[in-house]
Amino acid sequence: MTSQDALKKQAAEKAVEYLESGMVVGLGSGSTATFAIHAIARLMKEGKLKDIVGIPSSTPTEEVARSLGIPLVGFEEHAVIDVTIDGADEVDPDLNLIKGGGGALLREKVVAQATKKNIIIVDESKISDKLGTIFALPVEVVPFATASETRFLESLGAKVTVRENQLGKAFKTDNHNRILDADFGPMDDAVKIGMALSQRAGVVEHGLFLGTTALVIVAGADGIREMKAA
């Protein structure tokens, strides 16, 4: 395990301390959230967490949770999630996020908006003063609109890359859409950018998670610290 993975695991272990038996839990996506899923499964097997059900935010997360024996449900059974534990690609001092590095930003945002308390787990390298400083903004678009939305993002000042998979072909999301990675640099007004993107017909969703997070657990060389919403 790398030192970065060890930090992620520490943060995940701290996050699951906020779970209680009987909860509906949102299961995040990506390597950091996977550590939390494993921790949840272990606590269930030990009998320390009972009657937990999960709502996964991506197909890979669903597969991991099923393999570990975590019961899964949909929004048809539970429209409200008690706690979601997820990672992030970047976090600012106000707990606003950039997410979508793994391409699951649409379902992740649906889960986040249905959640009473969102807990984000990151290592120290993901913290910045302004969103866009360390990570480009993922924007999910319908394939038909790839070129037009690329031009629109460029008109806003972003350098845009069409995300590719490991085979060098266009990356497809769980919903069969494309991802444009828009590098704005440090954003002075992330809210304004988010609003502009939300008005575009070809944009399915963007990776700005603004005002959804209650708690960020940060793992660093000096240990664990918590950032809470004001």
From Swiss-Prot:
Q: Does the keyword Isomerase apply?
A: yes
Q: What is the lineage of its organism?
A: Bacteria, Pseudomonadati, Thermodesulfobacteriota, Desulfobacteria, Desulfobacterales
Alphabetic keyword roster: Isomerase
According to its UniProt entry, this protein's organism is Desulfatibacillum aliphaticivorans
What's the protein called, per UniProt? Ribose-5-phosphate isomerase A
Instruction: Briefly state the protein's biological role.
Output: Catalyzes the reversible conversion of ribose-5-phosphate to ribulose 5-phosphate.
Please list the GO biological process terms of this entry: pentose-phosphate shunt, non-oxidative branch
Is Phosphoprotein there in the keyword field? no
Q: Which SUPFAM superfamilies match?
A: D-ribose-5-phosphate isomerase (RpiA), lid domain, NagB/RpiA/CoA transferase-like
Which catalytic reaction applies to this protein? aldehydo-D-ribose 5-phosphate = D-ribulose 5-phosphate
Please give the Gene Ontology molecular function terms for this protein: ribose-5-phosphate isomerase activity
Give me the residues that bind substrate, please. 29-32, 86-89, 99-102, 126
Record-stated family: Belongs to the ribose 5-phosphate isomerase family.
